[in-house]
Amino acid sequence: MGIASGLCLSEAASEYLKPRYAKGILYSAMLASISTSLAEILGGAIALQMLFNIPIRAGSILVLIFVVIMLFTNTYRVIEKWIIAFVSIIGLSFIYELSLVEIDWNTALPAWVTPAFPEGSMVVIMSVLGAVVMPHNLFLHSEVIQSRQWNIQDDKIIKKQLRYEYADTILSMVIGWAINSAMILLAAAAFFGTGTPVTELEQANSLLAPLLGNNASVIFAVALLFAGISSTITSGMAAGSIFAGIYKEPYDIKDSHSRIGVLTSLILAFALIMVVSNPFQGLIYSQMALSVQLPITIFTQVYLTSSSKVMGKYKNSTYTKWLLYVIGGIVTLLNVMLLISFL
């Protein structure tokens, strides 16, 4: 969408949807961004507690201040380089952690492709779905692509950029999948495989030391810290993009609407952290909230990218459109199952 139309998802929603629908969608996306910021600030704060014994609330303030300074004093290009560095550290950390455990690949490989819904697991399943396919990122990706500002009237440039972004997206998804898989494999081998119950992140960190050595617990905390910081940065940027889109404007950290969006997401998330009694449950339920909003963003994006008015000749094919609608339907069905599990 960013390449073909020159608009990000939030701008396109405001431009092509009825105002009451556009505002409802974008305000719900802002709530999703707040949920993301809550989880990511919490994750960074928990990591600071693991490393330096800093209380959660004080650590949250430090993460918040650092992220605001990063966003308000750097261009996207600079932030992009920082994010790449952070993600590289996270990936290398979990590769090292995996080298310390023995993986039962005969069990792990089938589990990668075999879905299971154990009793009472829907909250965790949906929180993982929300954490992996974050709705705010769908807004941010189109904004990032749009910000490159190429000539959208030149078909050769558009086709070249579409091929590049397709490859870039696949590579990013593979890296994300690898890091998420590494975390799950580590938890399964170190804790589940040894019959060690874990209900808190701090507990996981403290148990890694006797199981895998002191280095393992420190590296786990470092990876968690960089994951929290990098994700809080992207969540803040997404909120700025979403809020600016309500006014049919692109993300620009120098613009008041973008700044209001960033601060709204981060400050409200911080305020919620101040009243959360159980940080681990706060992480779970905030990510579950993302999965609830996800179908709204999916259906919005599919509708807009399937419109010739928005995309011109680059709109989704009929096959792609209905495949994406089916995926959105599956996510919606999972949310219905989640609701039923609470009844």
Q: What are these language model-derived features?
A:
Residues A29-L48, W177-I184, A188, S217-G245:
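Membrane-helix boundary/coupling elements in multi-pass transport proteins
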Residues L62-V63, L71-V101, M288-L290, L294, ...:
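Membrane-interface loop-to-helix entry segments
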Residues M1-Y21, I46, T194-A209, K309-Y314:
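Flexible loop linkers connecting adjacent transmembrane helices
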Residues V87-T114, M126-I145, T300-K309, L334-F342:
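Hydrophobic alpha-helical segments and their helix-loop junctions in multi-pass secondary transporters
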Residues R20-E40, A45-T75, G130-A131, F226-S231:
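Helix-loop-helix module between adjacent transmembrane segments
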Residues M1-A4, I145-Q149, D154, V174-Q203:
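Extracellular/periplasmic helix-exit of transmembrane alpha-helices
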Residues W82-A85, S241, D255-I260, P279, ...:
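C-terminal membrane-solvent junction of multi-pass transporters and transport-like membrane proteins
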Residues P19-R20, R57-S60, S217, I229, ...:
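Loop-to-transmembrane helix boundary motifs in multi-pass membrane proteins
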